[in-house]
Amino acid sequence: MDAHALDNLMERMVADYVVHNQAASVLKAMLDETGVGFAPVIDHVTIRTLNIDQGAEPFVSLGYAYDETLQYDDWYAKVYRKPGYPSLFVDQAYPDERGKTSIIPGWVHKFGDKVFHHVAVRVENIEQAVVRLKENGVVFAGNIVGERGGHLRQIFSSPEMVDGQPFTVLELAERHRGYLGFLPPQADSLMKSSTGK
């Protein structure tokens, strides 16, 4: 596996995402100012696609491995992992009747499947992070999901709008007790908060 090629792919896609997401740009500037940078705090990245296996292929060919499948009412996701890199969350609508109500196909037709829908950054104190980012003009969609003291707490920024359509969001993720997974009810709630409605 070529780590240099994977680094280049991840750097290019994250840079493209940050350019098109105001919340991520604000956070990156804050982190760059301290010398931390954006890349070291990335928890996971998410691609929306019409075919999960094809969407994940560029990452799988560079060493990512399938870990788990998460299922929801009208969409599902596969999680891929590679030690030393952010988790990769790839989602799509079900290809049958169940997927008819999913927002994913419309998003993919508008924006493609070679861009990140969102990047999640790891935070130590999600409430404090929300307050500081709000002070710098970031708007959040909905409320923090997940119980205080629970394994995983998350929130999405309000989506960047392109031609009236929600494009990308920034996710803040607070994790505890070594938990690296995803909680389906929370992920579905976040998905719904990313519609811009």
Go through each PLM region and give its residues.
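Vicinal oxygen chelate
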Residues: 1-36, 40-50, 70-91, 104-197
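The feature marks the first
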Residues: 24-53, 62-65
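Short, structured motif recognition centered on aromatic/hydrophobic residues
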Residues: 41-46, 59, 88-90, 115-116, ...
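Amphipathic alpha-helical segments
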Residues: 50-66, 128-137
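Flexible internal linker/loop segments at domain or repeat junctions
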Residues: 87, 93-113
